[in-house]
Amino acid sequence: MAVTLPAGPRTPWTPPRGDGSALRASRAPGRAGRTVLTLALASWFLLPLAPLGLWLFADRWSYPAAMPDVWGFDGVRSALAQGAVPAFARSLGLGLAVSAVATPLGALAARALAYHRVPFPAAVNAVLFAPLALPAFAAAFGLNVLLLRLQVAPLAGVILILSAYALPYTTYTMRVAYGAHDRGFEDEARTLGATRWQVLTRVQVPLLAPALARSAFLAFLVGWSDYLITLLVGGGAFTTVPLLVASAASGTGNDSVVAVLSATAVLPPLIMLLGLGFFARKPPGDLS
């Protein structure tokens, strides 16, 4: 026998109200800690650059003076006279060329290692990461003879060797990205009739864009900051910013010139790193 209870007035449930002060108070120490950590890291990075910034505009700085004795732009003029602008353009072009070669190769290798059964994976990983264990001098000295016998242009040889040295960084970065990549988006796009090219350009590349940007940045750093391979394989005919810095630092009385060239070498990667950090921020509706 069923018992029917009389229906009473329905009172809608309302969540408890609060001013949120307890929640904000619990988050305050975390924000303060992050702020302190950010300031500490910024100070740790920027404080060593303070003397460099002073030397940029110091014509003479004698010991034990705490500040430069004479301010001026002699260092800038000397750096320009030594070919800082062409060297900057060559370094930029070299970094971009290495990035353009090593990034797609690293992405292809990472996708194969992540999604396909590769025979002898340990041996393949050893070959991919061998440039990190091989001394740069030995590699450049040995490969330089081979490139000369094959009549490979010095610039092309520099790009090839530096791309091989950048390949472990791009492969590892993209392998981590492919490991976290959801292939269901690609399958859904194919179900909806997308071609292989459309899946690549409209689904896979946008989802992996932050990882591709990180890989390209690491490969750019390899080409931008290289000294030994560019010197040995390039034969001294391809002068870049690191070569100019080393040449100026080997002399005496060139502190202001070294400061200008060092700033030229440091600022572009720093600007790219800041841009990479801004680019890597995902919008609220990002599915990746």
Stretches with model-predicted labels:
Residues 2-24, 28-36, 47, 58, ...:
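C-terminal transmembrane helix and the adjacent membrane-cytosol boundary/short C-terminal tail
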Residues 85, 89, 93-105, 109, ...:
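Hydrophobic alpha-helical transmembrane segments of multipass integral membrane proteins
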Residues 153-191, 198-204, 211-216:
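Membrane-cytosol interface at the C-terminal ends of specific transmembrane alpha-helices
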Residues 22-26, 96-128, 141, 145, ...:
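Transmembrane-helix boundary motif in ABC transporter permease subunits
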Residues 53, 84-92, 96, 113, ...:
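Hydrophobic alpha-helical elements at and bordering transmembrane segments
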Residues 8-12, 26-31, 61-64, 73-83, ...:
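Interhelical loop and adjacent transmembrane-helix boundary motif
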